[in-house]
């Protein structure tokens, strides 16, 4: 994987891309969740980098995409992603978003529906207003002070054991979390701003319709918020296929990478040919 940088008015986004294999396979774009970085998808990158073109980023303010001004919203992230992909010549991406990455994918679908070839949500939830209560939105807007108040050791424990069920998944997330060790203020700001962005995107009450082939993946033991409930409702309302990952938590792709990789691979194989652009 080749590390690159994409400049925005708020800072530089770091991302990684492989030397694209010469085939007709779609480009997989991996978007990690809130506070996680590109390492969240290391097992997916290992599996797919010799199969197709692969892109993964450290989201704005995350990992190597720092320093970064917190003066952007979810739609800005989607626009930056589109510009980044355009620079790399990616015209019909398949977005694979975990948690917050899935929200970015839905924002991308709202803005660039004609470009999106496929969408896979891993332990994410729908952005449509109908799924979320007013109380939930109110809380999302006020989470930064909560993160500032909680002791770091508690945040570290909940951010590792609370999102993964396996030794590998927890160890990986702990390594990622430790990049914020000694700078809890950055972690609180990053987390709070992410929740605020999410609330604002939901309040916008946009269609966020997924018009391309899509797949929902969720860990059976996901305890992050109401993710399990949201996925059931999302599947029931839209008919988007939903696959449950046995014994997996919120980071299902780290707890059961072989199962998630198989589902993504099968999803890719079933995609119709990309429509010619012109």
Where are these regions (language model features)?
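N-terminal cap/lid segment of alpha/beta-hydrolase-fold proteins
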Residues: 1-12
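Conserved HGGG/HGGXW glycine-rich cap/lid loop of the alpha/beta-hydrolase fold
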Residues: 11-64
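Conserved loop-alpha-helix segment in the C-terminal half of the alpha/beta-hydrolase fold
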Residues: 214-248, 254
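Flexible "cap/lid" loop of the alpha/beta hydrolase fold
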Residues: 110, 117-149
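Active-site loop/oxyanion-hole signature of alpha/beta-hydrolase fold enzymes
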Residues: 9-10, 16, 55-96, 262
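Gly/Ala-rich beta-loop-alpha elbow adjacent to hydrolase catalytic centers
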Residues: 97, 101, 105
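Catalytic active-site module of serine/aspartate enzymes centered on a nucleophile-bearing elbow/loop
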Residues: 238-278
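Conserved alpha/beta-hydrolase catalytic His-Asp/Glu region
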Residues: 130-132, 150-209
């Amino acid at each position: 994987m080749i590390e690159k940088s994409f400049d925005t008015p708020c800072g530089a986004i770091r991302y990684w891309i492989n030397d694209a294999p010469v085939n007709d396979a779609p480009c997989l774009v991996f978007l990690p969740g809130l506070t996680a970085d590109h390492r969240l998808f290391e097992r997916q990158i290992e599996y797919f980098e010799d199969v197709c073109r692969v892109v993964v980023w450290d989201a704005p303010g995350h990992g190597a995409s720092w320093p970064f001004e917190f003066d952007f919203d979810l739609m800005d992230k989607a626009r930056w992603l589109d510009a980044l992909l355009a620079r790399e010549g990616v015209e019909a991406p398949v977005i694979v978003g975990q948690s917050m990455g899935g929200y970015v994918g839905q924002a991308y679908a709202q803005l660039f529906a004609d470009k999106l070839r496929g969408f896979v949500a891993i332990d994410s939830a729908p952005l449509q207003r109908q799924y979320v209560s007013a109380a939930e939105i109110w809380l999302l807007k006020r989470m930064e002070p909560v993160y500032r108040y909680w002791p770091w050791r508690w945040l570290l424990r909940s951010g590792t054991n609370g999102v993964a069920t396996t030794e590998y998944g927890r160890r990986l997330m702990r390594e990622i979390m430790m990049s914020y060790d000694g700078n809890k203020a950055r972690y609180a700001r990053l987390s709070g701003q992410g929740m605020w962005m999410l609330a604002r995107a939901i309040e916008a009450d946009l269609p966020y319709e997924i018009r391309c082939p899509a797949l929902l993946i969720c860990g059976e033991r996901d305890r992050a918020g109401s993710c399990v409930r949201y996925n059931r409702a999302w599947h029931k309302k839209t008919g988007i296929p939903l696959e449950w990952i046995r014994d997996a938590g919120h980071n299902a792709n780290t707890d059961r990478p072989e199962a998630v990789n198989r589902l993504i691979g099968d999803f890719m194989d079933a995609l119709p040919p990309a429509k010619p652009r012109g």
